[in-house]
Structure formats: C-alpha cells, structure tokens
Amino acid sequence: FKQKTAYEIMPSLVGSEMCIRDSHRLAHRFGWDDNIFNHFSCALPGGEEFLVKAHGLLMSEVTASNLIVVDQEGRITRGNGTVERSALHIHAAIHLGRPDAFCILHVHPPYTTWLSSMEDNQLKMTNQNTIRFFDRIAYDDVYEGLAVARDEGQRMCQAMADKRIMIHVNHGVTVAAPTVEEAFFDLYYLELVCKEYFLVVSSGGSPRVIPDEICRKTVPQLEEEYLESAQLTMDAWKRVLEREEPDFRN
C-alpha cells in the first residue's frame, strides 16, 4: 500500500478526537482491550505531541473530552491525567520516526497475541483475507520485558521499518497508518485472520497455503477498494455506537 505523509491529510484536532474516541469504544466491543492497559494515539502536526487515553481509564470509558495531549517527554499539555509509561515510549518513538503514522494502535488481542506466542509466529496465507497482510507485517522477535524506556520505543520503531503492522513476540501487535480508519480496518482484519488461523491449526489438519504468486496477483485487487472499505467500515460501526452507546459523544 502506498505510504502517505500523515500531515498532508491531517484532520482537525476535533476530528482526531472523534476518530480515536470511536476506535477505543470499538476495541472494547470486540474484546481487544486489556483492562486499563493498551493504547491508541493520533499525532498532532509536527509529530511532537499526540492524543492518547489517560492512564487508568477503560477503553469503554474513553470520550473525546477525556483524551489527553502528551509531548515527547511525557508532559501533559492538555487535559487531566497521566500517560502510561509504555504508551509514551512506544507511541512517541513511532510518531517521531514514521511521518506516515498519524494513528498508532497498540493492543494485546487474544488471537494475534496467540500468534505472537508461537515458535513459528508468522501469519500464513491460508485464506483470502490473510492476503490483506501479504508482505505487510514486520515481526519483532525480541522480548526483554516492558517497553518502559525511550530506547525500547526507538528499537521498536526501527524493527517496524516501513511496515504498517508489527507483531511483537510474546507480546501483541502495533498498527500504524495515515488515518484512524485505515489502522482500525487493518487491526480488525488482522485479529480476524489470526482467529481463523488458530482454528485451522487447532483442527489438526494441514493448512493449505496460498502460493506467493497468487498473493501478489490478489494484493492489487484488494488495494483498489482498501481506502473506501476502511472508511465505510468505520462509518458503519459509528452508527452502531450512536444507537447503542450515545454517551460516546461526550
């Protein structure tokens, strides 16, 4: 997928708040959250500050009004609360090092985390949806504890290189994209295909892997509808939130 510079398509601060708020609520609905941990962010112009959830809030409690703005040093420049340590170091490093990464989603969802915990932790191309991730995933095979230092965030950014998705061994996943809609769409399908791959492996049968040449042929077909599909998907789930969680507007 073509890389874009996030700041060329940077929405307003209010628009950023709305989008990142919605993604937190939806992550809770889909069971991607991990108590008060895990973190999503949106960069502000220049990449020196970003919107993030205040530490201690559940994803189901996030509203636009209780998001905080944090700078590269962890100082809160708007809002009330603190930033979780790994949220600061992971997101600050990637926002600064990847100008295309307007939105970053870092989570430990069940099936992607299962894959990250396997000796062979690489996603196999076993069905049509897995091809969405053909040659798009970086695999970080270093786990040395919590990401609570600046150099660990920088190491993660380097390991991610130019990929939008990175699976962290024994840990979880980070998704980075120029828009919230694209990041959410990627995460939705990544967790889905990891679940499907888990079912294939658990069945005891041998996975039938799609040949690389077929994957390369199919990728452009998926790219044609990628941006529209990402936008329509987010719009559809926003309608669900409006019907069933009206307090999310706060």
PLM regions: where:
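Single conserved hydrophobic/aromatic residue that forms the stacking wall/gate
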Residues: F1-G15, I20
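Glycine-rich flexible loops
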Residues: S16-E17, R21-N250
